[in-house]
Amino acid sequence: MRHAKRGRKLGRDAAHRNLMLGTMAGQLITHGRIKTTEAKAKELRGVVDRLINIAKRDDLHARRQAVKVLKDKRVVRHLFEEVAPDLDDRTSGYTRILKLGPRQGDGAEQVYLELVNHRVE
């Protein structure tokens, strides 16, 4: 029975899942919006919210924690210098999910996951 089991496995082992979520978090921070499946977006929401809360502290340890997840110092710099200061007035809820409908090939529910301060050009 799955009582009190948190998180989704997304059909991957732990290392693959963590690397995928870190990469997707970096893409979301860089571009402000990504298109993905609903299950991945719901799992990624928590990762990004934690990263933004870490970035709000803006100290050396916070940067090292962010690099541990994101693996790219340029993305970390963007997170700390541009994204986190814009979201400083919020305590949580940094992302939103916009449903797009099922994918043509396999019927997986597609969504946009975006930062709430993202401006669509």
Curated annotation (Swiss-Prot):
Keywords: Ribonucleoprotein, Ribosomal protein. It comes from the Bacteria. Signal peptide: none annotated. It holds the Pfam family Ribosomal_L17. GO terms for molecular function: structural constituent of ribosome. One of its GO terms (biological process) is translation. GO terms for cellular component: cytosolic large ribosomal subunit. Part of the 50S ribosomal subunit. Contacts protein L32. Belongs to the bacterial ribosomal protein bL17 family. This is Large ribosomal subunit protein bL17. It comes from Rubrobacter xylanophilus (strain DSM 9941 / JCM 11954 / NBRC 16129 / PRD-1). The gene is rplQ.
